[in-house]
């Protein structure tokens, strides 16, 4: 009897341990593995994660700091190229008579480039960071070469699609490099640090573009970066490959032959990659986001069958993906434990809110400043850069704050979200020519500081909730959630503008100019600034812009309210714990 009782007790104890193991969170399991085997790669991790761990286990502090410096240079080059491209693309448009084809390519490349981050994240884990980086650097360079050498809109469209896919992928992989080489406590500061090139390129980019326009051509403005990117980015990948080989030679990383036939390898990667789940999720995002972009550029209306059917099918595919991942996927595309995590859900909602807010008030902000405040191009550009520069500078300070306090949730909830709400709300009041522009600068600073807090906090939330394997996928998820919110914000801003500006303009114009209202509206800021400040026509135009901006700012302010419950969903993580192995910052 006693033996039976002891056996039952042992069985119950084992069952309790297994049950407890199932309830342990992913981040706790990851930390336990690091504490128990700090100098060994994680044996059950995917090969890409093992390579990243092996690199960190064999390189020195000097190599780590040098690599960070080189990553900063890569971000500087990437941001500089993007800034120059944003200015030179208008001169490229001028050379083609079929610009709408370029707009279609812009829509598709933006959507595809964003959605591809999910399979890229999976590829980095299954294959390796350096390998994926080299592939997409190649795609980026090929895209730039095609753009620089194209002879028409079709060639430009093809090149721009390749360019944008490569650009978003390379930017994403650089962020993953930083996550691999930083501890959780210092990661917020590391992320903010690599964003600081924006401060330089925000002002240098337009000047460089002007120099290219004055002394060269738009083709060379693109083409020269094919050379610069090759000699800047390839050495970074070779550094990671060098230390990976060093880890193999020292026995830290042992590559075991799989022994699989080509057919078995295909089946293995088909199962590990979860192609069905990847297809469902990518299709859901594409079908949902694409119609909003098509509407924004005038290719499809809200009432069209194309718009409605694509949005409905896209929305329905999200629960289909969730059901597949939960009950049918042999290997989950996104770990179910992360998929249902309240912190991850709240972070995705917040990302959508941030981008919805930004694109709602920002879409027509440039033209509003030019017309209502009669600013020249340079001063308008400086005004629109306040958010980028301000949020970047503040993010560095917030990164230091997180390092010292070891927490971020309360700061986002009680400082970041209220400050963004305050800035957006004050924009409602201080819009229009009757208000001094200094008040708008103040509002922009509030929004920038709030945004800098929330963006860094959002990234930290998903990374703190994930294990080492899940970090790339979580970064991709909040990026996609941001695209989700941004697409809706674009569409809402466009709808508000189209339904308020023409009517307000028609009401305000003198009777003898009412017949020109369509020309003034369709001509945009270029036609509107031709009317002298103080004239009846210019006053009517300013009033129309004020009305349009009022409703856009009201919408942007209202959506920020959702940030509070989204942040409240987060777990109040302590970042003073282990998430990565080896020598990291």
Curated annotation (Swiss-Prot):
Give the induction text. Expressed in copper depleted conditions via the regulation of the macA transcription factor.
Task: Give the knockout phenotype.
Answer: Does not affect the xanthocillin production, nor of fumivalines and fumicicolins.
The alphabetized list of GO BP terms reads: transmembrane transport
Which keywords label this protein?
Cell membrane, Glycoprotein, Membrane, Transmembrane, Transmembrane helix, Transport
Molecular function per GO: transmembrane transporter activity
Where does it primarily localize? membrane
Decide whether keyword Transmembrane helix is in the record: yes
Q: Which InterPro entries match?
A: MFS, MFS_trans_sf
- GO CC terms, sorted: plasma membrane
Q: Which residues cross the membrane?
A: 64-84, 107-127, 130-150, 158-178, 188-208, 220-240, 275-295, 304-324, 344-364, 382-402, 410-430, 437-457, 473-493, 550-570
In terms of domain of life, where is this protein from?
Eukaryota
| Pfam families cross-referenced by the UniProt entry | MFS_1
Glycosylated positions are 341
Per the record's keyword annotation, is Nucleus included, yes or no? no
Subcellular location per UniProt equals:
Cell membrane
For membrane topology, the record states:
Multi-pass membrane protein
Return the PANTHER family for the record: MAJOR FACILITATOR SUPERFAMILY (PTHR23501), TRANSPORTER, PUTATIVE (AFU_ORTHOLOGUE AFUA_7G04730)-RELATED (PTHR23501:SF107)
Question: What's this protein's family per the entry?
Answer: Belongs to the major facilitator superfamily.
* Task performed by this protein: Major facilitator copper-regulated transporter; part of the crm gene cluster that mediates the biosynthesis of a yet unidentified copper-responsive metabolite. In contrast to crmA, is not involved in the biosynthesis of fumivalines or fumicicolins.
**What is the protein name given in its UniProt record?**
Major facilitator copper-regulated transporter crmC
The scientific name of the source species is Aspergillus fumigatus (strain ATCC MYA-4609 / CBS 101355 / FGSC A1100 / Af293) (Neosartorya fumigata)
């Amino acid at each position: 009897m006693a033996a039976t009782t002891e056996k039952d007790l042992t069985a119950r104890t084992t069952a309790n341990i297994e049950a407890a193991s199932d309830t342990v969170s992913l981040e706790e399991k990851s930390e336990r593995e690091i504490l128990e085997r700090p100098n060994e790669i994680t044996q059950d991790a995917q090969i890409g994660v093992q390579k990243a761990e092996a690199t960190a286990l064999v390189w020195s502090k000097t190599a780590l700091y040098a690599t960070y410096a080189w990553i900063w240079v890569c971000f500087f080059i990437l941001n500089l190229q993007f800034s120059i491209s944003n200015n030179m693309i208008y001169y490229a448009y001028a050379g083609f008579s079929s610009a709408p084809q370029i707009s279609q390519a812009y829509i598709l490349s933006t959507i595809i480039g964003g959605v591809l981050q999910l399979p890229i994240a999976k590829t980095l884990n299954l294959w390796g960071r350096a390998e994926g980086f080299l592939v997409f650097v190649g795609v980026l360079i090929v895209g730039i070469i095609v753009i620089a050498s194209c002879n028409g809109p079709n060639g430009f469209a093809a090149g721009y699609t390749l360019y944008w896919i490569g650009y978003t992928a390379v930017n994403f992989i650089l962020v993953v490099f930083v996550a691999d080489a930083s501890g959780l406590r210092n990661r917020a500061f590391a992320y903010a640090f690599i964003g600081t090139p924006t401060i330089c390129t925000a002002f240098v980019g337009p000047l460089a573009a002007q120099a290219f326009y004055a002394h060269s051509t738009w083709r060379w403005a693109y083409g020269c970066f094919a050379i610069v990117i090759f000699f800047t980015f390839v050495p970074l990948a070779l550094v990671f490959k060098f230390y990976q080989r060093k880890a193999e030679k020292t026995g830290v990383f042992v590559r075991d032959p799989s022994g699989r036939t080509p057919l078995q390898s295909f089946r293995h990667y088909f199962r590990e990659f979860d192609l069905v789940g990847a297809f469902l999720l990518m299709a859901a995002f594409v079908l949902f986001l694409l119609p909003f972009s098509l509407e924004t550029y005038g290719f499809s209306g809200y009432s069209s069958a194309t718009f409605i059917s694509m949005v409905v099918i896209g929305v329905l595919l999200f629960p289909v993906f969730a059901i597949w991942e939960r009950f049918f996927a042999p290997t989950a595309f996104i770990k179910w434990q992360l998929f249902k995590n309240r912190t991850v859900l709240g972070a995705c909602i917040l990302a959508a809110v941030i981008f919805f807010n930004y694109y709602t008030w920002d879409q027509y902000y440039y033209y509003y400043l030019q017309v209502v405040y009669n600013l020249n191009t340079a001063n308008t550009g400086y005004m629109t850069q306040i958010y980028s520069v301000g949020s970047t500078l503040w993010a560095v300070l917030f990164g230091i704050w997180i390092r010292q306090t070891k927490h971020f949730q309360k700061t986002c909830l009680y400082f970041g979200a209220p400050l963004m709400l305050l800035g957006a709300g004050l924009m409602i009041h201080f819009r229009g020519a009757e208000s001094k522009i200094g008040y708008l600068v103040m509002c922009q600073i509030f929004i920038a500081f709030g945004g800098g807090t929330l963006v860094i906090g959002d990234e930290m939330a998903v990374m703190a909730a994930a294990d080492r394997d899940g970090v790339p996928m979580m970064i991709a998820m909040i990026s996609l959630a941001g695209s989700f919110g941004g697409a809706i914000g674009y569409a809402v801003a466009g709808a508000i503008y189209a339904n308020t500006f023409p009517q307000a303009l028609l009401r305000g114009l003198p009777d003898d100019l009412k017949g020109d209202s369509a020309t003034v509206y369709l001509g945009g800021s270029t036609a509107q600034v031709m009317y002298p400040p103080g004239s009846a026509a210019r006053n009517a135009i300013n009033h129309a812009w004020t009305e349009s901006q009022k409703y856009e700012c009201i919408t942007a302010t209202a959506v920020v309210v959702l940030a509070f419950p989204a942040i409240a969903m987060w777990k109040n993580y302590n970042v003073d714990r282990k998430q990565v192995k080896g020598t990291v910052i």
